[in-house]
Amino acid sequence: VYKRQQYVEVPQVEGVPLVADMSSMILSKPVNVSKYGCIYFGVQKNVAPAGMAIAIVRDDLLGHAADTVPTMMNYTTLLAKDSMYNTPPCWCIYMTGLVLKYLENDIGGLENMQKINEAKAKILYDYLDGQEFFRNPVEHRYRSTMNVTFTSPDPDMDKKFCAEAAEAGFVNLKGHRLVGGMRASIYNAMPTEGVEKLVDFMEKFRKANA
C-alpha cells in the first residue's frame, strides 16, 4: 500500500532483489514471499502493539552488509543471535504469537482473512461509489482493502467531518499529510460492524451538509 493505493502486480526485474515494506497489509491476505528479496514490516498495524518490526530476508542477501551498517541493523547478526542480540521486545513477540494462532485457528488462515477484509472494504467502497458528496480518488483496481481514502466537497468540510466524527467516536480519520482528505484504516482487527457504523455516520453527515 502506498499512501492510498495498493499494488496489484508485483514488479520483477531479473537480478534485482525486490524489497517491500508491507506494514499496512501484512497478514491481510496470502503473500508469495518467494518473489521478494526482503519483506519488512512494523507490527503496529496488523500484527501486534507498536514496538517491533519483522524482516523476512532471502538467504543469499545476508552477509553483504557494509562496515558502516550499525550492528543493530545488520540482519546477519540478528539471525546469528536468534533475534536476541539485544533484549527482545517480549510483549510484542508474545502478542504476535497470539495473533498468528488466532489467524490460523479462529479465522482459518489468510485466505479467509482476505475474504473478510475484502467484504469489509466493499461496504465502504460501495457507499462511496453510490453517492456524490464523498469521493474516492483511486482507480478501482488499485484500491486498498486496508486504508480507504475519501474526500468531501472541500478542505473545510473535511475538517468539519473529522471533528464531528471524533465526537461520535470515530477517531484518527484525518488523511495522510501529503494527500489530505480522510483515511479510514480498516485493518484485520476492525470488525465489520465498525465499518457499517462509519458508513451510517457518513450518510448522516452527508444529509446534514449536502
Predicted feature locations:
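Short, small-residue-biased leader/transition segments that mark boundaries at the very start
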Residues: 1-2
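Active-site C-terminal subdomain of aminotransferase-like
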Residues: 43-125, 139, 208-210
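PLP-dependent enzyme catalytic core of the Aspartate aminotransferase-like
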Residues: 167, 176-210
